[in-house]
């Protein structure tokens, strides 16, 4: 098995000399196709061993590189079939990967490393060949163009494209593991694109020579790699990461990458660095607009316009499901982070204080209701069967009066009483005590249990030089709803409800940009009052009071997929009921929807 350290060491050394094919290996194309067809009949481990052996022998075989690429394509198809089976063991996991799943991840990444190692030799040899041809005297320019130079250029373009494709798949695996890609991966990616620009292969349509499924040119593939990084997918649920990766082809067609910026964009890539796409700030190491830096600039406005148009079309068609929520989240995230970044309050050390956040709609509702279940809050015993809640908000723990510790996180806030901005920053404190955020009788907070948002569940030693760690998916994700509970001594709680707009994943204290939705909260139950065929069972809801400083109106936050604009709903607390109308939708994510409401 090849791990990252072996892979990096191989790329850092000179390409090994080509060796004669072993007698046991047949380089005939038809023979290899027959081998690939029979490969799935074997056990998975045997398939992996055979693929590793064939890839190694093809890499060092003394054959023409055009023939090598043809044979590589056959092996690549066989490897992709096996990889698809291996990935089924972990891509739908909702929690941290266990050791069993990490073993499959390691096997998949090993195959990708081996493929890159094979293509790397082709790239180096073709670059040397093109340089030699360039230095030779020009005797017959047309003949040279249609023979050596042209075929070498196509071979180089195909090898570069396939290498970038393998790097894309590696980055996809890192994202599913919630692991930060190593700097060397992005250095290699940037260098490949830079080389393709220099060799003028970046816009060659390789679909005329090999099957392509995700892009036709090196430039299009690089655009997908950049977009995947800009979307900060590690701050999403794993299911959404998979959906983003499937939609990259469509989305990247609206991404514009140029050497000369077309607008005042601040998103760029330094092609001579190991950095992923970066947003220009005062802390950047370089000024990308200086001519002596080799940078490309990324324009996102056209992509956001496409996402918004697609989202609006789904609304018209009444298809406001998973794709709609993802489109909405991505469009809002790109606008917030890169196009029209909102000014968050400067971090004031004098105003720093520790607080706690509760995530998960049901846990938030349970806390705001003073730890009452939904049935208790709305006196469900007095309701007919067709209005009874179908589920409870109380945590499923040994003790019913405990809030789920897995949704409680300790944070640092940087606010003061006169803060007017609705966009703020907090720091997540890892490996911290997660106390009961409800005040005890003496007004003090009481600790409950330890919690770490980034905990190592399992470690698999796939090689003595490489260790894979299992990372818990973040509970505070982009567009996550949360309740911020500040320390308080009075009877009334000091809290705010907000939504995550951006999360930095790699700091010691992960930084979270969030939007305040309100401070005055009431927990209640809501049911549909319309006379149609939809369910009329009560569901949990939160009334958010309007705020003059935040310039917000009274609104209702409910779990997504229950209601729509124009609905007449019944709000209930104890036995008291009020009729409301949902006037306008203010926000919708896969977790919650927020509506402006009026009382009827």
Regions inferred by a protein language model and the residue ranges of each:
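Generic hydrophobic, helix-prone segments enriched in Leu/Val/Ile
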Residues: 108, 114-116, 122-123, 134, ...
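Short strand-loop-strand
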Residues: 329, 338-491, 497-523, 527-600
